[in-house]
């Protein structure tokens, strides 16, 4: 089974392998997906820069891909990783650190 990229970018929810904690949400195009499969590190597509980026390439806070899951419509991906350092560019463990309720 493969993701359906016919409508463009797919959301990729990144979770920590041991805790299943949600670390971040990013987007993948087909090239980012293929690079992720090949390198076992996360690659995403930046909508603002309109280019690929490798998580942790500059910070060293890389994500080692353990498994990938595809949803029932083949248009969303869950990426299970072993995170090195914080996932968020702010230095927080997860990008979801602002509690609303």
From Swiss-Prot:
Signal peptide: none
Pathway: Amino-acid biosynthesis; L-histidine biosynthesis; L-histidine from 5-phospho-alpha-D-ribose 1-diphosphate: step 3/9
Cellular location(s): Cytoplasm
EC class of the enzyme, as a word: hydrolase
Cofactor detail note: Binds 1 Mg(2+) ion per subunit. Binds 1 zinc ion per subunit.
Binding locations of Mg(2+): 71, 73, 75
Keywords, comma-separated and alphabetical: Amino-acid biosynthesis, Cytoplasm, Histidine biosynthesis, Hydrolase, Magnesium, Metal-binding, Zinc
E.C. number: 3.5.4.19
Main localization (coarse): cytoplasm
Binding-site residues for Zn(2+), renumbered to this chain: 72, 88, 95
GO BP term, pick one: L-histidine biosynthetic process
Gene3D superfamilies: Phosphoribosyl-AMP cyclohydrolase
InterPro entries registered for this protein in UniProt: PRA-CH, PRib_AMP_CycHydrolase_dom, PRib_AMP_CycHydrolase_sf
Family membership noted in the UniProt record: Belongs to the PRA-CH family.
Main function: Catalyzes the hydrolysis of the adenine ring of phosphoribosyl-AMP.
Protein name: Phosphoribosyl-AMP cyclohydrolase
Organism: Bacillus thuringiensis (strain Al Hakam)
